[in-house]
Structures are given as C-alpha cells and as structure tokens.
Swiss-Prot record:
Cellular compartments per GO CC: cytosol; extracellular region; ficolin-1-rich granule lumen; mitochondrion; secretory granule lumen
Residue sites binding ATP 1 per the record: E95, L96, G97, A98, T99, G100, A101, S102, S438, V439
Pathways per UniProt: Carbohydrate metabolism; hexose metabolism; Carbohydrate degradation; glycolysis; D-glyceraldehyde 3-phosphate and glycerone phosphate from D-glucose: step 1/4
Keywords (A to Z) from UniProt: Allosteric enzyme, ATP-binding, Glycolysis, Kinase, Nucleotide-binding, Repeat, Transferase
Name this polypeptide is given: Hexokinase-3
Residues at which ATP 2 binds: 542-547, 686, 753-754, 790-794, 869-873
Entries under PANTHER family matching the protein: HEXOKINASE (PTHR19443), HEXOKINASE-3 (PTHR19443:SF1)
Record field: catalytic activity: a D-hexose + ATP = a D-hexose 6-phosphate + ADP + H(+); D-fructose + ATP = D-fructose 6-phosphate + ADP + H(+); D-glucose + ATP = D-glucose 6-phosphate + ADP + H(+)
Gene name of the encoded protein: HK3
Source organism of this protein record: Homo sapiens
C-alpha cells in the first residue's frame, strides 16, 4: 500500500468490467452517493474532540508520561533558535523522505541581506524500489553517491562543506547532529537502520565514498526545515506544517516544558509526529469503511492512522476506493470498472488536485478518467469532483483540528491571551491542491478563535530551511565562542580566588601595622558585642545614601523600632557641609516632635556609612565621600563635631551623641544581639565593606594589649594599589573610568550592586559590536548609563523566571531581543554576579582565617552578620559567597545571618553597649 504513486495511469491497457445487475434508479443513486459522501463529513464537535484529544496527548508526551503511551511522540529536535535574517554562507542540503521515492540535493547560498535571495541549485534522484526495501548501507551509499554526483557538477571546493540532512521519518534526537530512526514510513523498509544513528550512517557512507570532506552539522525533518525556511517577518514563524506524502507539524516549545531535556531556559523545536495519532475515541467516529480498507491493505496496518486520512500518499487512494465502490454499485461509469480503477496507486495526488481544480474544467477530469480506462458521462465528471472535494475537505479539516491543538499548546506555553503567529506550510498537498489551505485556515479560525494565524508558504520545499538550520547552528556556535571568550576572565578558578585571599591577608596585616595599604583597617573603638543585658531607649541616625532615617530604638527583652525616612535632595548631598548637617538636625527635630520626645536627651548612635578614621567612639574623621555625596568642607573633619555644631545652631535641642558607627559595624552588632558568635559584619548593597573583632594587640595606634576592637576594613578600596590588576577586565576599566572616582574603590566596583549593572551594560555593548547580540544593531537604550539596577540583576537571574519573563524584563528596559539574546544576557549577568560573589567570599575567607590564627585555633566557629540589597535579593549571591568561604577556609565553620535593620538597630546597640560599659566603669 505504501508504494502508492509509483505506477500512475496506464492508458489504453484496460478493458471495462460492467455490473450485470440492473443499475439503481435516480433516487437510489442519489441516496447511495449521499450515504457514501456523508461518511467524510466531520462535525465541529468531532473536530473539537480531536483537537482536545491531540492536545492532551501532546501534553502527556511533553511531561514524559510513559503509561499509557501517548498517541503522539513530541520529539525534541534540538533546534533551539529561529533565523533572524543575518545568516550567510554556502550550504549543502540532502533531503531524504520528504518526497517519497526520491532524494534531493541542494546547494543553498544565504546572503544575510533582507530581500536578496540567491536561487538554490538542486537535483532530484529517483530511489530504486530495491534500494527503498534493501539494506540500510545500500540506501546511504546511494545517498552519498548522489551527493558526489551533484557536487561534481558544482564549481566548489572539495574541502570544508557544511551539510544539513533532512530526514523525514520518526526519529529520536539526542543532539542537533544525532538522530536515531524509530521506524520507517512512506514505503521505506531498509534493514539495519531502525535503532541506529542516521547521521553516523550518512557520515560512514560519505567516508566510504571518499570524494568530499563534508561536515554533517544538523539533521532535521522536512517539517522543521519548512518552519526554518520561512522568511523573518512582522510576526514570528514558530510553527511548521507539512502535508506531503505524509503529514506532520513542529513548533517552538519552552524547553522547561519538555521533560526529556531537563532544561530550564530557552526554547526547542518539537516535532509533534502527529501522523501516528490514533485515539480510537476521537478518530473512531470519523473513520470510514474506505479508511479501514486502505489501512488493511497498507504495509503498516494499524499505524499512522491520522496520516492515512490526510497525507498525499493516501488521498488519491481514498478517492480510488470511493470511485470503485460507486462504480460497483452502478452509480458511476454505468456500473463499469477497469483494471486501473481496481489497482492500488492508480490515482495520484496530482490527479485529485487537477480534478478538483475549477480552473482545469470538466475536460481535464474527463481525460484523467479516460486514462483510467473508463468512459465517464457528464454526470460522472461532476460526481467524481464531489468525491475529490469530500476526501480533501475532510483532510484539511482534520489537519486544522491538529494545528489548532498545536496553537493551543503554544498559547498555553507562552501564557498569552491571544497568540499572533506565522505558520510555515509546505508539501505538495498544501502547494498543489486548490482549496486545501483556505479550508485549513477557515477551520483553524473556527477551532482556535483566540489565535491570529498567518499561513506562509515555504520556500524551496523546505530545502532552504534545512540550510537555515545549519546556518543558525554555525552562527550560534560562533556566537557561543565569542561569548565564552568575553566571559572567560569572569570565571575565576580556585588558584585565582586563593591569590585574592592571600593578597587581602597581606593588605590587612599592613593596614593594622599602620603601613601603606589599600585596606585602611580603621579602629572603630567598639570593644564588645552585645551580651543581652542592654536596656533603655536610644535614638539612631542612619546616613548612607539618598535616604536618611531617624529611629527610636527601645531595648528591653527584645528590640522595638520606630522609624521615619527622610530624603536628602541632590542639591543638599552635593552642597555645603553646613547645609547637609542642618538638614539632618531638622529631620531629627521633626521626628522627636512626632514621637513626643521633644526636650528629652536620649543617647544617640550615628550610623555614618562613609570612610572615616575614628579617634574615639564619638570621633570620626571623614576621609572621603563616596556614593555620590560631595558636600564641601567635610572631608578631614570630625563628623560628630559637625553634627553637634548643627545641633547648637538649631538651639533648644539637646542630643547626646554617644557613638559614630558605620553600617557594617551596625550590622555586626545587630546580629550579635541575636548570636553571641557574630564577630564579623558584611555589607553588599550599593557599596560593600566588612568589619570584624580584632585582637587589640595587633592594632597599631590604639593603646592596650588585651581585649578586642572592631576594625572597619573599608575593603571597597582593596586593590587600589594595583594588587587586583590581574583580575581587572576591559569592562571593569571602562566602568572605573566613567565613575566619579576613577582609580578608587576597585574591589567595590567589582562586587557592589552600584557597579555590576554597568559592567553588564559594557559587556552587552561589546557583544553587540561583535554581532552576537541584537543582530549587531546598535541599540540606543544600551548607551544609557545605569539602566541595570541591582533589582534588575536579582530579577533576571531568578530561578522561577521563564525565559519569556526574562525577555519581558529586558523589553521593559527598551531592549528588543530574541530568545537567544535573552539567554546570552542572562549568562552575562550570571558571570558578573558570580565573580562578585566569589570575590566577596574570598574576602570573608581572609577575615575568618585571620580570626582563627589570632586565637590559635585548629577550627573556628563564627557568624557573619550580613546586610545589603544585593546579598539579600539576589537568588544566588549568598550561596556562592558561602561556597567560596567553605572552599578557601575549610577549617572555619561560618554561619551567615541576615541582619534586620543593622544601620538603625545596630547603631542603637553600639550606643547601648557603650552605655553598659561606661556604667560598669563607673561602678
């Protein structure tokens, strides 16, 4: 049965065989015809049932559910990207199985220029019947011979040819160039191929041929080739539909929905393999006696039932079976049949298309029937056209039901209310049948009204698409190499991180001794962490960014906080120092009035998150402004004195400033109230810094050899002496040069949220210039500084985000991109944030090892209080920091505690501890 189409019409050889019984009367004839054609009528409800059943089978197969076996296979093709129009180069295409008993070789040139197409050169070779049914090696040797014969006629270099292999049979793919044949269809039954990798079989045959050096880059089926050959247009072409000898569809599915891939990101083209759909509940009611006969007489009874109602290999045979039945019943041809009419394969798809085409007229129908050895009358011609229309209309409607299921799956996958998509169509049924596509589109609109579908005829029968798959694979491989080269400096190994740890240990030692060092190692005069006995009401001020907070902190058996946020206008932050501190005092007075504290003199802790050299607990000399502050006449001054002077200017305000604290110390103290082992503070937010409890004997410039003191490392400046030069990239240099403090805070500029987004932006600009991103087109929005905030980095790397959500975030920023672009942007973000976390971890490892050695311990158990938006919000940062510390400081058990309001609560606790210690001293 699968050999239908090989014989064609045999004119002049037939003798008529006529029914000897009396012919039916006109009314009986009409009833017989209606009864026969009625079998091919499919109701809307039946189409909807097929749509729903197929959709259910698709979802079952995507989930990897094996029992009961799904009715469709949903095979991933490992084609993860659709073309974007810039692909170029020369490619060889070998098509096997797309057009029945022939193979085709093409030479395809892609220009990469929109609207400029070069017609492919091609040659078709008929496959002998003995090859189709012989040994597998014989088939692939035949294919390799055809390749060589075609290429011999082309003016081409014999070396380095890239080939795309279109193999249109059900296959299990495990890679773009690895595909195992599941089963033969379409009349092929070559031995020794099922269960084998067809790409390897082709490579072996090419090697045996020995004439050309050909790299088989990709294997796809004709359906994928059809989709990929669709010209990029206004709407994405993400569905391929082929109705040729057989029928199938493919579409771009979210990779996370394809269980067998175990991938979270990106998309993959899935071959539905709907020809094998055979749900008895859905298909049973629409199967006719003719379908059963056709199936029974085929090479594969019971298989490919859906395909046998739609594919071009079978439409002519269905028409033949109906015509033979009506002739035997005496309704057609005066009750006469012919040997041709009773022979399989005598009516081809081309005959059906011609007989139904209104432009050919009755004369062509008459001629075709005469070639079958029949003598049709005028009424016979009209009835034959009705039969052709009934068979083909049903095929188009069934195909539409299946396509509607695919569109519903795609819509659900994208979580879109309405779906706008282009469907690339290919195959001789779509191309040659006069009404197939119009019936198809009308039925799809009926079954999937929420989908706006454009049917786009394929170019070159899918051959160009196979070349496009090959070209896209080559482009992606080249882009992947460029991306890896760009990101390689951000991927730090153990030795590099250990070197950072060692460099920091040296800088710490120098700073503690008072020698020149990029780490200032500033004494904070905080000599103890909380012990839980602290009590009282305290005020806290928190100045470290564009917002300023005033807090009332009540310490009893727990800590209660009341606070208010006040903004600091840019004119104040960059105006005079007096203006800044007067504004701060105004905010404090406003807060006291609102809280009913006017006239009270509560102990006050001042969180001042800028580099200071402390001369006492309540004396801090500002070394330099950071974070965009530039208030004049402050650097080199005691900021507590500046605050007290502003209090004096305000008059009638009494404030007892007990301690000046930076946010890092406040974080350590805040967590220390909950965990006595917390002796390290870490901030990773807009900026970054760390502090820890150092042995007083190691701190030069502070009298005393016993006890401990918290040291403010100011590690953001680590590397300002050039010690991090080996890790600095061209992108770090660009960010540094564009900053307000070039050459300073080099460590901070590789770690903190204020700079990571800028590093990402500079990398994206570089990749765009290489043509890797945005099709090489300069995006104006990408020229804008600081468009990537910490929140953006945290959101885009979230494990819970699908790729479409990553794209949405980027599109909201004004960056139009493809799924491939989105994946690459994601990788860039991951590389930059991973390096930041690892560098931070190397710093923490240096600190904990210093504490362990200070105390002469084999093992140290210590806690780190952490604050900062990057650390808290980023999905991977905290775990990467912890993993790096474990790797570099294996003898330290380090617990990370997230601080709750370290800047406010911590400053109050520093004040509370100072009051407790002062009270003990008085006692």
């Amino acid at each position: 049965m699968d050999s239908i189409g090989s014989s064609g019409l045999r004119q002049g050889e037939e003798t008529l065989s006529c029914s000897e019984e009396g012919l039916p009367g006109p009314s009986d004839s009409s009833e017989l015809v209606q009864e026969c054609l009625q079998q091919f009528k499919v109701t809307r409800a039946q189409l909807q049932q097929i749509q729903a059943s197929l959709l259910g089978s698709m979802e079952q197969a995507l989930r990897g559910q094996a029992s009961p076996a799904p009715a469709v296979r949903m095979l991933p093709t490992y084609v993860g990207s659709t073309p974007h129009g810039t692909e170029q180069g020369d490619f060889v295409v070998l098509e096997l199985g797309a057009t029945g008993a022939s193979l085709r070789v093409l030479w395809v040139t892609l220009t990469g220029i929109e609207g400029h197409r070069v017609e492919p050169r091609s040659q078709e070779f008929v496959i002998p019947q003995e090859v189709m049914l012989g040994a597998g090696q014989q088939l692939f040797d035949f294919a390799a011979h055809c390749l060589s014969e075609f290429l011999d006629a082309q003016p081409v270099n014999k070396q380095g040819l890239q080939l795309g292999f279109s193999f249109s049979f059900p296959c299990h793919q495990t890679g773009l160039d690895r595909s195992t044949l599941i089963s033969w269809t379409k009349g092929f039954r070559c031995s020794g191929v099922e269960g084998q990798d067809v790409v390897q079989l082709l490579r072996d045959a090419i090697r045996r041929q020995g004439a050309y050096n050909i790299d088989v880059v990709a294997v796809v089926n004709d359906t994928v080739g059809t989709m990929m050959g669709c010209e990029p247009g206004v709407r994405p072409c993400e569905v391929g539909l082929v109705v040729d000898t057989g029928t199938n569809a493919c579409y771009m599915e979210e990779a996370r929905h394809v269980a067998v891939l175990d991938e979270d990101r990106g998309r993959v083209c899935v071959s539905v393999e709907w020809g094998s759909f055979s749900d008895d509940g859905a298909l049973g009611p629409v199967l006719t006696t003719f379908d059963h006969t056709l199936d029974h007489e085929s090479l594969n009874p019971g298989a490919q039932r859906f395909e046998k109602m739609i594919g071009g290999l079978y439409l002519g045979e269905l028409v033949r079976l109906v015509l033979a039945h009506l002739a035997r019943c005496g309704v057609l041809f005066g009750g006469c049949t012919s040997p041709a009419l009773l022979s399989q394969g005598s009516i081809l798809l081309e005959h059906v298309a011609e007989m139904e085409d209104p432009s050919t007229g009755a004369a062509r129908v008459h001629a075709i029937l005469q070639d079958l050895g029949l003598s049709p009358g005028a009424s016979d011609v009209e009835l034959v056209q009705h039969v052709c229309a009934a068979v083909c209309t049903r095929a188009a409607q069934l195909c539409a039901a299946a396509l509607a299921a695919v569109l519903s799956c795609l819509q659900h996958s994208r979580e879109q209310q309405t779906l706008q998509v282009a469907v690339a169509t290919g195959g001789r049924v779509c191309e040659r049948h006069p009404r197939f596509c119009s019936v198809l589109q009308g039925t799809v609109m009926l079954l999937a009204p929420e989908c706006d579908v454009s049917l786009i005829p394929s170019v070159d029968g899918g051959g160009r698409g196979v070349a496009m798959v090959t070209a896209v694979a080559a482009r992606l491989a080249a882009h992947r190499r460029l991306l890896e080269e760009t990101l390689a400096p951000f991927r730090l190994n153990h030795d590099q991180l250990a070197a950072v740890q060692a460099q920091m240990r040296k800088a710490m030692a120098k700073g503690l001794r008072g020698e020149a060092s990029s780490l200032r190692m500033l004494p904070t005069f905080v000599r103890a962490t909380p012990d839980g006995s602290e009590r009282g009401d305290f005020l806290a001020l928190d100045l470290g960014g564009t917002n300023f907070r005033v807090l009332l902190v009540r310490v009893t058996t727990g800590v209660q906080i009341t606070s208010e946020i006040y903004s600091i206008p840019e004119t104040v932050a960059q105006g005079s120092g007096q203006q800044l501190f007067d504004h701060i005092v105004d905010c404090i007075v406003d807060f006291q009035q609102k809280q009913g504290l006017s006239g009270q003199s509560l102990p006050l802790g001042f969180t001042f998150s800028f580099p200071c050299r402390q001369l006492g607990l309540d004396q801090g000399i500002l070394l330099n402004w950071t974070k965009g502050f530039k208030a004049s006449d402050c650097e080199g001054q005691d900021v507590v004195s500046l605050l007290r002077e502003a209090i004096t200017r305000r008059q009638a305000v009494e404030l007892n400033v007990v301690a000046i604290v930076n946010d890092t110390v406040g974080t350590m103290m805040s967590c220390g109230y909950e965990d006595p082992r917390c002796e390290i503070g870490l901030i990773v937010g807009t900026g970054t810094n760390a502090c820890y409890m150092e042995e007083l004997r190691n701190v030069a410039g502070v009298p005393g050899d016993s006890g401990r003191m918290c040291i403010n490392m100011e590690w953001g400046a680590f590397g300002d002496d050039g010690s991090l030069a080996m890790l600095s990239t061209r992108f770090d240099a660009s960010v540094d040069q564009a900053s307000i403090n070039p050459g300073k805070q080099r460590f901070e500029k590789m770690i903190s949220g204020m700079y990571l987004g800028e590093i990402v932006r500079h990398i994206l600009l570089h990749l765009t210039s290489l043509g890797v991103l945005f099709r090489g087109q300069q995006i104006q929005r990408l020229q804008t500084r600081d468009i990537f905030k910490t929140k953006f980095l945290s959101e885009i790397e979230s494990d819970s985000l699908a790729l479409r959500q990553v794209r949405a975030i980027l599109e909201d920023l004004g960056l139009p991109l493809t799924s491939d672009d989105a994946l690459m942007v994601l990788e860039v973000c991951q590389a930059v944030s991973q390096r930041a976390a690892q560098l931070c971890g190397a710093g923490v490892a240096a600190v904990v090892e210093k504490i362990r050695e200070n105390r002469g311990l084999e093992e140290l158990a210590v806690s780190v209080g952490v604050d900062g938006t990057l650390y808290k919000l980023h999905p991977r940062f905290s775990s990467l920091v912890a993993a790096t510390v474990r790797e570099l400081a294996p003898r330290c058990v380090v617990t990370f505690l997230q601080s709750e309001d370290g800047s406010g609560k911590g400053a109050a606790l520093v004040t509370a501890v100072a009051c407790r210690l002062a009270q003990l001293t008085r006692v």
